[in-house]
Amino acid sequence: MTTPHAILEHTFGYNSFRGTQEAVINHLIAGDDVLVLMPTGGGKSLCYQIPALARAGTGVVISPLIALMQDQVSALHELGVRAGFLNSTLSPQEAWQTERALQNGELDLLYVAPERLLQDRMLDLLDNARVALFAIDEAHCVAQWGHDFRADYLKLDILQQRFPDVPRIALTATADVRTRQEIIGRLGLENAQQFISGFDRPNIQYRIQQKNNPRQQLLRFLRDEQKDSAGIVYCLSRNKVEQTAAWLCGEGFNALPYHAGLSASLRAENQRRFLREDSIIMVATIAFGMGIDKPDVRFVAHLDLPKSIEAYYQETGRAGRDGEPATALLLYGLEDVVKLRQMMAGSEGNELFKRQEQQRLQAMLGLCEITSCRRQTLLRYFGDNLDEPCGNCDSCLTPAQTWDATEAVRMALSCVYRTGQRFGANHVIDVLRGSNNEKILNFDHHKLSTYAIGKHLSVDEWRSVFRQLVARGFLDVDASGFGSLLLNDACRPVLRGEQAIQLRRDIKTTATSATRRAPVAVAPEDEGLWFALRACRKRVAEEHGVPPYVIFHDATLREMLEQRPLTPSEMLDISGVGDSKLERFGDEFLEVIREHEYA
């Protein structure tokens, strides 16, 4: 049997394993079941690809990512790995050829969608094939409360019953303790070895800003910091996705929309362009992103509040997979909380489910309003610890100021009470600031004792007060109606003057108030070779019909730039260059280097 180290070096072109990879691989090769939690970019795929090559038979990978299977298989072909996939995109003839290759033992890895795997015909095929292992990718899809839930994942315990001697590995990039237990219970992994890597992504800078003028805030961020960068902008609704993408195009950016309401062909084309072209901004709902391997995504921006810390961590984790500096920007306001609570109130599910959804939203609000290190709070949620503040989030780079808001809070709560707990924040703020608009006059709210008592604070300052009161649980939102603010038991000590309140003072954030660490720059004297290597990669990628990063990551090109290999043996010493890639297109890159070296 070929050793894991030999496969790592000769097939994948790397000299050493990272983190827990080697331990995971050894357990799986030995026939043990394994559960792996590893952050995005941590190298999860090697944890099943190498054992599939080391063990006799075919490694079967169950994945919900139908749209990405072709790229995943193409990437393996470039490495010289015999791989195939089965899903609904194949013609009957193509599917038959792949099934025949499986039966004949001609596949090292087979990617299959869960709904395809669970068909009797497919299970019968696997009965008659030699299966090396089952890899259940994106295992958090088994969690019924998660936005990535796939009903077919609940039936994957059949693998344990029908193939008891075949080892299984379940993998995910994000799972709190509750989701972890759900994965174990539903997939029958009670005896699995668990490998939980740290959740920290130190290269991602986390920033959360009050939403004032979101389009202008996003535009300033893009123009000042992300010129020519690839990134993802998340929006809550399909309509907002399309409007934002069109607006960005009008501002000179190359932006594409992605949501479940678009045709399958347009989604596939936009995804293909995002993966293959430079400087594309994908504007999307949460329907986009799972399994996206593009390493050079420099930013993820949220124009609406995610429903949970799990969703936020997973979506922001799509930035900076190459380890280079990246930014996660979230713009959030009180209207986000109202909208999400209304959506949750109207969602399917019993009261327990809805209560758990509200608790997850409350945890997300806590992350938004925290005045200490955001990364420490984020990691603590997943049971991970960071001893010192990170120095790479907005709270660390621009420490939050607080102010004694006790009197302002009492004014706010009193005005909610005086207006009958029937209105949203905008109307209550108008009353506090003494507006004489038609709505106030119609309801006689200009006659209230709280009318015009809050002129000393601006509209934005009052919005900050109400946002923080809702986030900290001093006010409730009537989710079933029009977002009216409601008093609760927690606010009574404040109204009675028994409790003082400190609130965060929102900062008018500019792009320079948080320090952006730029990706490693190329020295001026190296720029000619750098651009020539990138041009060579793009040309080879187009010839092979794959995204450029499938040929070589930027880190590999950067090492070529530093080491200047001139022979095949020297090229093999470059991290990311294995035997197959050297044979297929190593000469083209060597020729580029030689031309510049001897020029």
What positions do the PLM features span?
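Helicase motor core with emphasis on the C-terminal RecA-like subdomain
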Residues: T2-T11, N15-G19, A23-S45, L53-R55, ...
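Short helix-to-turn junction characteristic of helix-turn-helix DNA-binding domains
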Residues: L28, L222, F274, C368, ...
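Short, charged low-complexity linear segments at domain edges
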Residues: L352-F382
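Flexible coil/turn residues that form the inter-helical turn or adjacent wing/linker of helix-turn-helix
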Residues: P164, K227, T371, Q421, ...
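Accessory DNA-binding and partner-docking regions appended to nucleic-acid-acting proteins
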Residues: M1-I7, Q356-Q358, D387-A599
